[in-house]
């Protein structure tokens, strides 16, 4: 790799612009403009059909976008037809403004206005490239020539809007802003604003595209702050950003840019777009949400959004994509699962006003996800907290702590052997197969009790070993389970101590099943566990004891 062929291609403002760094958070949502139907669509291997675009447009409206870029109508007949379809079929709500893109070239601008006939609310977005590299290599024009292109385009927009009797809003982008000298970008933008003369009731949009991301985010923020402080008509200008993600910092560019004075963000759902994509509006919006700031977009049914996006575009969402990927809430690590399980119990008990569960930046249910399928996931790395949480929340089994540990070792061993994640139903079946009502090699066929003096109990226990003949033994104890345990020890010369016993109902009704958990300790100190399920809690406890013995 020849690193010497590369150098910085960005330009810092002529004066320090770091006021944005004094702020630690975004306080309100910007104006959002979706460019999914333009930047997103043109980046697809197979662009969307007219029908898919219409459905995508409806989805964006449903999410809450009030400004939607619908295409470059002069660029192709398909994009022209799409805009005409939206207008002629009256698909644009009164509170939604469509945005159309045009180069600062006369015939393209005129074609764009032709496509807009009959549109009630529109933003006409004109652009030309201003960067040093494009001036030198692509257009071979001077700064004065490039400025003239922008001004002439701005004049034509104003002229055609007046001729049409419309009140379209105007937007200008110095394309490749990040590779443009800030002083020159400011000069061009102010010249355009001088043409448009924006007012409080008809503001102009100045859009600063990170067409190609060239710097660290703080550099972009400083460039944005410089523009915000020095633009003419600033109170009547909506300062917009259009970040791309070439260096993987699109979200940071947007967030720091808002701190630096930006009022508006252009981006896409899930970060779709050319090369590495546009800024992901979902991530920026949800980052605000998790700090208590309303993004003013509805992401409450994220699975629906994901499905629709993949259906329309043919793209797949990365499993690790923030907030929307299939694994973003998943915890496989044992310590993480334990912390989440304890955090969830704390939330249930304390009912606090704010969400603070470890490892979960937001409540997954806020965006249509669920704990069972999305949060606690079991594989060979998982621990007792995760296994216990699944068995308790999904199946109502409140295992003793040490039994949860034993069950987690069993689950991890199976997962490791099969090289796969275990689903909740597979974990439940594994628990039943391993710890519930195991009747081999020892099995009890019948038990009868007799009350003795001083609270003692006599048990008549009929049992067999490995399918052999049944034998009946009598033994005493200080309780029913203790008496049965003594009978089994006597019959089979077993050595263990009964060290743990808990029970609870599995349902809230008079005929509910009960479950008992029994732990025994062998002479070598190893614990063995069993569970018994039966409507009769005495029978359930006996089955649990037998299972623990069989699991030695």
Predicted regions and their residues:
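Alpha/beta enzyme core
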Residues: 6, 32, 46-67, 83-89, ...
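Short beta-alpha connecting loops at secondary-structure transitions
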Residues: 134, 208-210, 238, 266-274, ...
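A mid-to-C-terminal "edge-of-domain" accessory segment
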Residues: 1-38, 292-474, 510-513
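N-terminal capping/small domains of soluble enzymes
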Residues: 1-106, 370, 375-378, 382, ...
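Positively charged, aromatic-enriched nucleic acid-contacting surfaces
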Residues: 459-463, 506-529
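Catalytic alpha/beta core domains of metabolic enzymes, predominantly
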Residues: 215-348
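Mixed-charge, glycine-accented linear interaction segment located at domain edges/termini
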Residues: 526-529, 533-552
